[in-house]
Amino acid sequence: MTTSHQATSIELVTDGLTLEVLTAGAAVRRLVVEDDHSDGVVDVVLGHHDARTYAICGGYLGAVVGRYANRVAGGTFTLDGHEHHLTTNEGANTLHGGADGFDRRRWTVAETGADHVRLRLTSPDGDQGFPGRLEVEVTYRIGPGTVRLDYTATTDRATVVNLTNHAYVNLDGEGSGSVDDHVLRVEADTVAPVGPDLLPTGLAAVTGTPLDWRTPHRIGDVLASDHEQLRFARGLDHHFVVRGSGMRTAAVLTGRSGRTLTVETDQPGVQVYTGGHFDGTIVGLSGRRYGARAGIALETQGFPDAPNRPNLPSTVLRPGEVFRSTTVWRLS
């Protein structure tokens, strides 16, 4: 364990896999793979060249986002008859917990072992406008070809919770170019289409749209279509309702080399974001700048804007309850 630029770095190593996690944002900074798909080692997640950037303007790279991942319309919601006003950071809306979300916080190391690290954060009552003191933990655990993420949260007052990790993946290597040549499959019959503000407009079948990824497609081929949903999001930035319940496969991604990432989760959906905002501003660990679609985020989570949509599964957490969520990344 080393400390650099006031951010603690924890490195977990197993056969063929190295994971670096920072206390800044509880962020995955590196996921280095050594396998038969390439010569030498390859870092398959995007990470900032300067670790100090995570706590300042990290762009969510590899970070845990919260208290509410994704968007809350108008930066407001009503819970138990009380209206709560959140900080807004995407026009009139709240994205990923607000202007000072969990991605910008200094998490503390609660426990470390040879194969895992557990990080903890306390979010006080009223933080970014959210009610209740929230105690959050995330545990990263590595095994042969796998990274497991376990989240827990408790509160002393009714609140809403939606946590995810915002890692951007490029299976051909961080800084190697766009993910256009990656092939993606998403286990979803239903998606949440978006409006120009990227808020969901409801739920719809994926059939007959460029949001149908039930059979694998090359990302660049689909994103080349002239479709309103792709124009709004500069590619994909959509919540897909994962088929089934319990732990199951949400998405499968394959790079040019044949390296494959399978994402498994117990959450209702996965937000698929193809990184349309990257514009060369962010410098990666390789020293290269990240252009459009430098990585793809597969964010397992509850429904966006669920606090304002009673027809969707609830994301409310009450005193005495424990929020739990598990996601597994499998590399092969």
Give the residues covered by each predicted segment.
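An exposed, glycine/acidic-rich loop-and-rim segment of catalytic or binding clefts
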Residues: 1-332
